[in-house]
Amino acid sequence: MVSPATRKSLPKVKAMDFITSTAILPLLFGCLGVFGLFRLLQWVRGKAYLRNAVVVITGATSGLGKECAKVFYAAGAKLVLCGRNGGALEELIRELTASHATKVQTHKPYLVTFDLTDSGAIVAAAAEILQCFGYVDILVNNAGISYRGTIMDTTVDVDKRVMETNYFGPVALTKALLPSMIKRRQGHIVAISSIQGKMSIPFRSAYAASKHATQAFFDCLRAEMEQYEIEVTVISPGYIHTNLSVNAITADGSRYGVMDTTTAQGRSPVEVAQDVLAAVGKKKKDVILADLLPSLAVYLRTLAPGLFFSLMASRARKERKSKNS
């Protein structure tokens, strides 16, 4: 039985429910609308930011660098494509100018050929890059080399070679182009690092070391360049389905020549390039572009280091057993 007091309170309860629901729903939809508008404005600003921007991309002849060239070109950027193979760069330019139907005005790219491990060539290359359009808006440090091997079997020369390509080369090119950006108080430095710049896995020591150094340098650069209004973005992809593992060097410097299973199952470089474009357009500072497990491993390394180290030791044992079987 419902008491008289309860009966009297029922209309009040229903009235309160009605008021609450009618107040919350508009508020909820309003918040969603504001969020959607914010994302739309971000997208529009990103498109405008990239259109007609002078973008330098290293390692543009293959893999992620080549796909980045395609998406930045389609976005209307003025490209300066860099690499060691001039013929491959020319072929890429022909491909870009012949096949891309875009809604924005595009510009014929320039090419600059040089080796990132040659410090003298980098200085000359930077001068040549600046001659193309007179300035640089965005530098995408993408070129790199991977490595497979045990620490004890790896010569120091191999360690140096990986560091020269992945760390010292990009640092030297960045330093060579920074003065022109500082003078204009405008510019954006992008470092394509790796998830292994945030945590390390066995038999990748030289590569992981070079990417940890990359992360540290560009984090410092971001803080120091804030006064000049220069943006710095570090992008850390996980496995990408490219020839990175095939072209990796081994402990003695020879070519690895194997497509690792993890690499073969990695993300499409086309998708990753689109994510890079979006991150640059939104001026993000630090981005992880990896699947769930590698991303979780980054946090596990910090929150539960003992467990992380045990898992890496187990991985090392399994890889050794697999190679010896």
UniProtKB/Swiss-Prot annotation:
Main subcellular location of this protein, as a coarse class: endoplasmic reticulum
GO biological process: ether lipid biosynthetic process
CDD domains: 11beta-HSD1_like_SDR_c (cd05332)
Lumenal topological domain: 39-325
Membrane topology summary: Single-pass type II membrane protein
Residues that coordinate or bind substrate: 194
Gene Ontology molecular function: any one: acylglycerone-phosphate reductase (NADP+) activity
Pfam families: adh_short (PF00106)
Keywords per UniProt: Endoplasmic reticulum, Membrane, NAD, NADP, Oxidoreductase, Signal-anchor, Transmembrane, Transmembrane helix
InterPro entries referenced in this protein's UniProt entry, alphabetically: NAD(P)-bd_dom_sf, Sc_DH/Rdtase_CS, SDR_fam
Chain residues that bind NAD(+): 62, 64, 207, 211, 242
Topological domain ranges for the Cytoplasmic compartment: 1-17
E.C. number(s) listed in UniProt: 1.1.-.-
Cellular compartments per GO CC: endoplasmic reticulum membrane; membrane; peroxisomal membrane
Function: Putative oxidoreductase.
Family of the protein in this entry: Belongs to the short-chain dehydrogenases/reductases (SDR) family.
NCBIfam families reported for this sequence: PRK06181.1 (NF004825)
Protein name (database record): Dehydrogenase/reductase SDR family member 7B
Organism for this UniProt entry: Homo sapiens
